[in-house]
Amino acid sequence: MGGISIWQLLIIALIIVLLFGTKKLRSLGGDLGSAVKGFKKAIGDEELTVKKDNTEADADFEQKTLSKEEQQSEDPVQKSQKDKEQV
């Protein structure tokens, strides 16, 4: 009723082909396709860069963990002396 039917779309397509010709429409379609392909490639490259950045570590050092025995065996006096030595 208020929408565009298939026949109206076919008539519009026929008018466009008559106005521009098939060669110009082919080249226009090829240009549009290459633009979309380039856009997808750029988006894919950006995603790879983001994934690569996320997997790299911020710094090159190893995380050290103390076992429970080592943590309990340290004396509070020794801890304060170590803290003073580090400053």
From Swiss-Prot:
Keywords: Cell inner membrane, Cell membrane, Membrane, Protein transport, Translocation, Transmembrane, Transmembrane helix, Transport. Belongs to the TatA/E family. The Tat system comprises two distinct complexes: a TatABC complex, containing multiple copies of TatA, TatB and TatC subunits, and a separate TatA complex, containing only TatA subunits. Substrates initially bind to the TatABC complex, which probably triggers association of the separate TatA complex to form the active translocon. GO terms for cellular component: TAT protein transport complex. Coiled coil: none annotated. Disulfide bonds: none annotated. GO terms for biological process: protein transport by the Tat complex. The chain crosses the membrane at residues 1-21. It is found in: Cell inner membrane. Residues 54-87 are annotated as: Disordered. It comes from the Bacteria. This is Sec-independent protein translocase protein TatA.
